[in-house]
Amino acid sequence: MAAKIRKGDKVIVLSGRDKGRTGEVFEVRPDAGKALVRGINVVKRHQKQTQTQEGGIISKEAPIDLSNIAIVGKDGKPTRVGFKILADGKKVRVAKRSGAEIDG
């Protein structure tokens, strides 16, 4: 299946405690169907001390399910993603709401 959400996309959270917040995807895990979004779904983790890293409680982003996020269109509203094949044979992502091409 083609990737509808990719690294670098600006997304909005559709459900959960961060509903309505936007952020940038910095990692996608297609095998698990999850993504990491900067500043979204931040949890506290107890970090054991190592030689290079100090121990303590750290905050980090936890994966969020791909079904709970949507790409933000040019109008600032969430949009679904479709695919279109151009005349030169190149496959591009298209916003279903506006029909505009999605960069990336």
Swiss-Prot record:
One of its GO terms (molecular function) is structural constituent of ribosome. InterPro entries: KOW, Rib_uL2_dom2, Ribosomal_uL24, Ribosomal_uL24_CS, Ribosomal_uL24_KOW, Translation_prot_SH3-like_sf. It comes from the Bacteria. PROSITE patterns: RIBOSOMAL_L24 (PS01108). Keywords: Methylation, Ribonucleoprotein, Ribosomal protein, RNA-binding, rRNA-binding. GO terms for biological process: translation. Gene3D superfamilies: 2.30.30.30. Part of the 50S ribosomal subunit. One of two assembly initiator proteins, it binds directly to the 5'-end of the 23S rRNA, where it nucleates assembly of the 50S subunit. One of the proteins that surrounds the polypeptide exit tunnel on the outside of the subunit. Belongs to the universal ribosomal protein uL24 family. This is Large ribosomal subunit protein uL24. The lineage of its organism: Bacteria, Pseudomonadati, Pseudomonadota, Alphaproteobacteria, Hyphomicrobiales. The gene is rplX.
